């Protein structure tokens, strides 16, 4: 679905593990990495699209994850002019995304990128929470930064933190 402004309605998916790391996927046959994402079909809610894309791209189902949060607003990015398909109608100039923060609830061995009819990814790894903001293709950076900033306080509790501070050396 493309809205009246030329943006394709889309979902973005951030999957966290219990160590505060996020799932980072390598695009099929390319050297670029990104979060799973995909278009919203006619008649589909953002949440339905997210679960469909999660299965098609990562091989996970609703029972394999817990939805922690959804972005408050739609986040948009424009495609570079060289990537716009000017000959297709309606013309899509970018993506308008609803983002989801998920926590992995199953063993990571269930991740299977070969479930969809044409795989989007051919590799994946866990990375530190803020790593994707620095590493994603430049035209997506602002959207990634905004989504990750919104989810940060919710994602960080998954991480096992070391307690910082002075050690109590008082012996009474």
Curated annotation (Swiss-Prot):
Motif Nudix box: positions: 38-59
Gene3D superfamilies per record: Nucleoside Triphosphate Pyrophosphohydrolase
Residue ranges of domain Nudix hydrolase in the record: 6-149
GO molecular function, one term: mRNA 5'-diphosphatase activity
EC number: 3.6.1.-
Entry's Gene Ontology cellular component terms: cytoplasm
Record-level GO BP terms: mRNA catabolic process
Requisite cofactors: a divalent metal cation
Keywords: Hydrolase
Domain of life: Bacteria
Role played: Accelerates the degradation of transcripts by removing pyrophosphate from the 5'-end of triphosphorylated RNA, leading to a more labile monophosphorylated state that can stimulate subsequent ribonuclease cleavage.
HAMAP family with a match to the protein in the record: Nudix_RppH (MF_00298)
Family annotation (PANTHER family): M7GPPPN-MRNA HYDROLASE
Record family assignment: Belongs to the Nudix hydrolase family. RppH subfamily.
Protein name: RNA pyrophosphohydrolase
Organism annotation: Vibrio cholerae serotype O1 (strain ATCC 39315 / El Tor Inaba N16961)
Gene responsible for this protein: rppH
């Amino acid at each position: 679905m493309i809205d009246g402004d030329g943006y394709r309605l889309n979902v973005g998916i951030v999957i966290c593990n219990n160590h505060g790391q996020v799932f980072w996927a390598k695009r099929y046959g390319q050297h670029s990495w990104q979060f799973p994402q995909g278009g919203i079909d006619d008649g589909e809610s953002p949440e339905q699209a997210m679960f469909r894309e999660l299965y098609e791209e990562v091989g996970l189902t609703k029972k394999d994850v817990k939805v922690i949060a959804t972005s408050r607003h739609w986040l948009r990015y424009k495609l570079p002019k060289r990537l716009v398909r000017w000959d297709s109608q309606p013309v899509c100039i970018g993506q308008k995304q609803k983002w989801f923060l998920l926590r992995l609830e199953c063993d990571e061995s269930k991740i299977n990128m070969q479930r969809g009819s044409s795989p989007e990814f051919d590799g994946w790894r866990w990375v530190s929470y803020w790593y994707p903001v620095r590493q994603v293709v430049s035209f997506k950076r602002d959207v990634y930064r905004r989504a990750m900033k919104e989810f940060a306080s919710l994602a960080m509790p998954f991480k096992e933190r070391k307690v910082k501070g002075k050690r109590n050396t008082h012996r009474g």
